[in-house]
Design a protein with these regions (language model features):
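Acidic, low-complexity intrinsically disordered segments
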Residues: 69-79
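Long, compositionally biased stretches
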Residues: 1-65, 85-110
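Exposed beta-sheet edge/beta-hairpin loop segments within beta-rich domains
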Residues: 79-85
Length: 110
C-alpha cells in the first residue's frame, strides 16, 4: 500500500550539520524517514528555523547505521546556518509536500 503525501505538512527537530562549505539537516527519526522515502530527489517547500526555501529531499542509506533524509541548505544563507550550528545544533524542520497542480502543472486544463 502506497502512502500519498500530497498536501502534507511534517515537522521534526533535526541536527544541523556542516559538510565542507555546505550546511544540511538530516531527518533521522525512522517514522519520518519511512514517510518521506517515496519523495527521494523531489523538490518540496522546507522551513528550517523559520527560514523558508525550496529544497530537494535525498534519501540516504549508509553502509552502517539507519537510513535518513538529507536536505542541503541554501549556500547564500550560510551566515544564518553557521550561527544556528554554533548555538543550537538542532533546529525545527518543516517539510511541506504540495498538492498536485499547485505549481502550475494543471493550469489551463479543463
Amino acid at each position: 500500500m502506497e502512502i500519498v503525501l500530497r498536501g502534507t505538512h511534517l515537522v521534526d527537530i533535526a541536527p544541523l550539520w556542516k559538510r565542507g562549505d555546505l550546511y544540511q539537516v538530516s531527518i533521522m527519526r525512522s517514522e519520518m524517514v519511512e514517510l518521506l522515502r517515496d519523495c527521494d530527489n523531489k523538490e518540496v517547500m522546507v522551513i528550517v528555523a523559520g527560514v523558508p526555501f525550496r529544497g530537494r529531499l535525498k534519501y540516504e542509506t549508509p553502509k552502517r547505521g539507519h537510513p535518513y533524509i538529507r536536505i542541503f541548505l541554501p549556500k547564500k544563507l550560510n551566515v544564518i546556518w553557521a550561527k544556528l550550528h554554533e548555538t543550537a545544533g538542532k533546529v525545527k524542520v518543516e517539510i511541506i509536500i504540495e498538492n498536485e497542480g499547485t505549481r502550475g502543472d494543471s493550469y489551463g486544463k479543463q
